[in-house]
Amino acid sequence: MSHNTSIASQGMPAMAGPETGGAGMTDNVYQSLLRNRIVFLGSEVKDENANALCAQMLLLNAEDPEADIYLYINSPGGSVTGGMAIYDTMQWISNDVATVTMGMAASMGQFLLTAGTPGKRYALPHAKILMHQPLGGVGGTATEIAINAKMLKDTKRELSQLNADHSGHTLEQILEDSDRDHWFTAQEALEYGLIDHVYSNASQLRGDAPNQ
């Protein structure tokens, strides 16, 4: 897979958001959230912040293998490899992972949102969700182009199958609906099966989480 392969939206400006590894008040805020079993994806998915999110979920699993973990998402998408590391960690740990989006869950952000524990996938009322196919630059020699094109095609099918599994649609339906940028309002995402609830108040979410 090309390192350029991503499922970030074409033409979409980079989302401003916290990056792991800084210092100061922002770090203190995110450490406080972690103590409350909340991890936050607030920027483009990159290998660096994906590693941090995986480590945080593994830590929370080690501390309590039963209590829910909350993954909050406001992301334009990004690295497929980074996103798949987060996805596999969500499946690996024993905890339910509740996913919550505000602002935007686009591309890989949508994929991770929909991959949350069934019944515990949430959107705030004005969130926007984007589903589409992975993007990747293909260059080099003819042989390299053919290899990368096959990898991109395989990645497209793999992600589409997982999206189908988590949303209750067929692979064919997901491939058709995501062939071009497909934007959803929170309510439309609920009706399509990408999420389970549209909530405007945190107390509603907590009521769905008996382990908290």
Curated annotation (Swiss-Prot):
Keyword hit for Hydrolase: yes
Catalytic residues identified in the record: S107, H132
Gene3D superfamilies with a match to the protein in the record: 2-enoyl-CoA Hydratase, Chain A, domain 1
Subcellular location: Cytoplasm
Keywords tagged on the record: Cytoplasm, Hydrolase, Protease, Serine protease
Subcellular location, principal: cytoplasm
Protein known as: ATP-dependent Clp protease proteolytic subunit 2
Annotated source species: Cutibacterium acnes (strain DSM 16379 / KPA171202)
